[in-house]
């Protein structure tokens, strides 16, 4: 085994190229996240003190270490990374990591898991761009399962990977073909449904068909694959 391969196997390499995703921590959640984002094209770095049990491809690299360690993050080239996903099991470690990461890269998109929903404001204040509390989501689904099972089934269906559907977030820029059109107009586009709009007035689920799309809106689109 040549030296470069030894370093890659044990997680010793210093990353020099730009990175699409850094995943911090390895558990069931980070494994599910990895499976969803890995298209064998995006560059992905996994930082964990436990080596992931996955089939590594050329676009994926493992670094053995503490995700809140500044040196480890620098070796993972966090300064040139686009997104970092914090999936560690300990909320305190995640909060510390957010501070360090934001100091190293003010522009990186930090996506954080929080086990305790009460810590979400702290994570946002520390510099996380998006924060998710999986336990709160799971608890909500379990609480309504007995009385509204098909609501839960619909939610699980829409949030699961499907070969027939894609969910896209589309920012409406100046000059976009969507500007000035209503959602009713958009239905004329085959296999496209707008299921949410983020506007200057906030987020609206299942907006009215007469809503007129404006510059600055973000459209949540469900598109069916065309066969």
PLM-predicted stretches and their roles:
Residues 1-227:
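Cytosolic regulatory regions of ion transport systems
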